[in-house]
């Protein structure tokens, strides 16, 4: 505890006379403590039979707080979790966490906040008076003879808990991530490493806090890493090592047109967008590289081409919606796979696809001219793309559709 909910104030943790923290060190075995009185030795006294301070601790001044102060709200959240053994509010609403996880989350966030304190942000989160009290305690810890340490005082614990509680008390992951971004930006501005692999800040933290951390870090990640960590989903998480190969089996090399119609990417053809987004679906939640993901889909594109398209989409206004759709599609394929095994279809030769006699019969029955060989090649390439999910340009008949002699069909 760092605050009193009955009197709406910060707890006092040091003697008003000798400034010694209470119960910081074990008392002498020869001493019988008197409740309510300071049991520390008077300054300058030595030995066992020395005079104790004996100051009445009830007269120690305490800092009053408004009834809705963030420090008191965080204390209420902790007390409720202690009473039930489970944290159910804020980011834990969708996935309740045990008390141990809540304490670990508070320690992880609070420790990082107080290790590199941004006083302007802390003043906004608490108040000028609370921060002034903390600065006074820190100054006394630095220059005082028997001063309390700033990081062990009630005011420091209250500030750390309030700052952490403002994040943990958010209604959802996105809101909590928005409240955490100042902390990540401040750390990076001061040269501290903050990455997806080093952002834990403590052991035993909850999955909910890890999701918030990854979501807050999203703008500092490359597009491929955003997909790997699912930063645009409701529950960002670490990549899984075995999710890519199975998912790629049920994906066409060119992502379904209906999924890609609303993607705006200037200077990039629709086929390139489809092939890049298919690779993006494979990347979601996996550690696979761009080149390996493209290979799983039949090498219809290259890692460099995919990277270029993803970067361009990432700079568009609709990027967040596109990545969210890609992540939702990946989750859908993991839960309920596609009815078509595209990995098997990619191995089909399709050598006897649409014989010329059948093509002529179709054209005559439809009242159109069969045209030259180019028209038949175009129809075969279109069928190849529809059946295999791979680009029609990879079909054996595509050679008839290229070259300077190519004319309108």
Residue spans of the language-model regions?
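Basic, alpha-helical nucleic-acid-binding regions used in initiation and control of genome expression
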Residues: 1-409
């Amino acid at each position: 505890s760092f605050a009193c909910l009955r009197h709406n104030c910060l707890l006092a943790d040091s003697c008003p006379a000798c400034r010694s923290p209470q119960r910081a060190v074990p008392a002498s075995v020869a001493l019988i403590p008197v409740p309510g009185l300071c049991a520390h030795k008077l300054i300058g006294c030595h030995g066992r039979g020395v005079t104790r301070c004996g100051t009445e601790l009830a007269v120690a001044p305490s800092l009053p707080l408004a009834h809705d102060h963030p420090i008191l709200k965080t204390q209420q959240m902790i007390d409720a979790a202690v009473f039930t053994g489970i944290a159910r509010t804020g980011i834990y609403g969708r996935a309740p966490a045990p008390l141990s996880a809540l304490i670990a989350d508070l320690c992880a966030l609070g420790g990082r906040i107080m290790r590199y304190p941004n006083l302007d942000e802390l003043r906004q989160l608490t108040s000028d008076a609370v921060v002034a009290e903390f600065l006074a305690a820190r100054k006394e810890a630095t220059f005082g003879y028997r001063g309390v340490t700033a990081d062990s005082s009630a005011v420091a614990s209250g500030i750390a808990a309030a700052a952490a509680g403002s994040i943990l008390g958010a209604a959802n992951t996105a809101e909590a991530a928005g409240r955490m971004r100042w902390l990540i930006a401040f750390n990076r501005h001061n040269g501290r490493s903050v990455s997806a692999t080093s952002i834990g800040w403590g052991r035993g933290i909850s999955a909910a806090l890890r999701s918030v951390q990854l979501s807050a870090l999203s703008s500092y990640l490359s597009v491929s890493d955003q997909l790997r960590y699912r930063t645009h989903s409701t529950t960002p998480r670490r990549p899984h090592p075995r999710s890519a190969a199975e998912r790629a089996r049920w994906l066409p090399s060119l992502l379904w047109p209906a999924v890609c119609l609303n993607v705006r990417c200037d200077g990039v053809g629709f086929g390139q967008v489809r092939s890049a987004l298919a690779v993006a679906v494979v990347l979601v939640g996996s550690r696979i590289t761009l080149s390996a993901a493209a290979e799983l889909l039949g090498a219809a594109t290259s890692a460099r081409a995919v990277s270029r398209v993803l970067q361009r989409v990432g700079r568009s206004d609709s990027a967040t919606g596109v990545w969210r759709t890609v992540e939702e599609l990946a989750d859908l394929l993991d839960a309920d796979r596609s009815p078509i095994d595209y990995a098997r279809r990619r191995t089909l030769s399709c050598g006897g696809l649409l014989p010329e006699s059948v093509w002529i019969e179709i054209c005559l029955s439809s009242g159109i001219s069969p045209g030259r060989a180019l028209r038949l090649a175009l129809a075969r390439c279109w069928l190849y793309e529809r059946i295999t999910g791979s680009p029609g340009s990879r079909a054996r008949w595509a050679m008839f559709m290229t070259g300077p002699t190519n004319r309108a069909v």
